[in-house]
Amino acid sequence: MGQNGTVQPTQLVIITGMSGAGKTVAIQSFEDLGFFCVDNLPPTLLPKFLELVKESGNKMNKVALVMDLRSRDFFDHLFVALDELAEQEWIVPQILFLDAQDSTLVARYKETRRTHPLAPNEPPLEGIRLERQLLEEIKGRAQIIYDTTGLKPRELREKIVRQFSVHAQSGFTVNVMSFGFKYGIPIDADLVFDVRFLPNPYYIEHMRPKTGLDDEVSSYVLKWGETQKFLEKLLDLLAFMLPYYQREGKSQLVIAIGCTGGQHRSVALAEYIARHFSADYKTVVSHRDMERRKEAHR
């Protein structure tokens, strides 16, 4: 029930994505959040399953399902079911797509000594490439995309809890992420901004081991005229764009701010941007690569 006594729509999260990207950790995290969870539900059974959910009388008002390419009839039945769900008022479906860079997925397969389900007799990379092609359409329909490259299982759980816990369910989220271009562009980013043109604290020796979270580094990055002019233009652009992204029904917008190593400039600016919009939007800030460079100086 809602605060005014009305019945709240059932929340349905369909978890899918690349094999090895973290679907098992994800479904366990949703179970911890009180979701009714089903792993590897065949798409042909989705309509019947949802009938049972509806007949439960809101007793199953939070449902998470893992659906992947282990079911060969994945696409035809899933897309039909999703189109039908879009017309239903009693349920709010979301697709959570888990992805990771190919090199990360290969490393995970080697670590677990498992074969890829789509190419059991081939090197993992062959199966990964095939799966990525087959999943392209469902990824395009996903409301939420998580890049689990570099994420530990605990960090993925924390990410899910932040977004899907009861206290986090207030709609549109602005996710501001810093990263280093030398480690690759985040594959879950909606908008990417390059701040490598700004003065770099890395070349000041005593600042090199610090990060953009340190006041001295942040002040250095923000003091320059070009930084202030860039922020003025960027914040104005984002203030214009965010309401339109929200109107399109996106549950989150990932804004990625990149510098060379993801330790100084991008961190300071990501923090600044997140603070700026926190009064009007639910904001989350994360620093994908900050610890990589920091640990190198220990």
Swiss-Prot record:
Residue sites binding GTP per the record: 68-71
Keyword Nucleotide-binding assigned: yes
UniProt KW keywords: ATP-binding, GTP-binding, Nucleotide-binding
Gene3D superfamilies linked to this entry: P-loop containing nucleotide triphosphate hydrolases
Residue positions binding ATP: 17-24
Keyword GTP-binding: yes
Residues forming coiled coils: none
GO MF, one annotated term: GTP binding
Purpose: Displays ATPase and GTPase activities.
HAMAP family for this protein: RapZ_like (MF_00636)
The family this protein is said to belong to: Belongs to the RapZ-like family.
Name of the protein in question: Nucleotide-binding protein GTNG_3015
